[in-house]
C-alpha cells in the first residue's frame, strides 16, 4: 500500500475538501467525531476516487469522495 494525502469531507454527503491529512493505509483518523479508515488504493481506487470507511453506531458505511487523494 501507499501513503496518501486524504481530504476529508465536511459531512458524509459532502465531498468538498476542507482539510488534508497525511494518512497511512489501514490506519484511522478522527474528524468531526467520525472515524475514517484508509483502504488500499490499488483495490479501491476508481476513476480518481477513493473509498473511506466510516464507523458509526456499530455499522460501516462506504463513502465515495471524488478527487481527494494524492500520492506522496
PLM segments and residue spans:
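Acidic, glycine/polar-enriched metal-coordinating patches/loops
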Residues: 1-72
Amino acid at each position: 500500500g501507499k501513503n496518501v494525502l486524504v481530504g476529508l469531507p465536511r459531512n458524509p454527503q459532502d465531498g468538498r475538501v476542507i482539510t488534508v491529512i497525511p494518512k497511512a493505509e489501514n490506519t484511522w483518523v478522527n474528524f468531526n467525531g467520525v472515524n475514517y479508515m484508509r483502504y488500499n488504493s490499488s483495490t479501491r481506487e476508481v476513476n480518481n476516487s477513493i473509498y473511506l470507511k466510516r464507523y458509526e453506531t456499530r455499522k460501516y458505511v462506504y463513502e465515495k469522495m471524488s478527487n481527494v487523494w494524492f500520492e506522496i
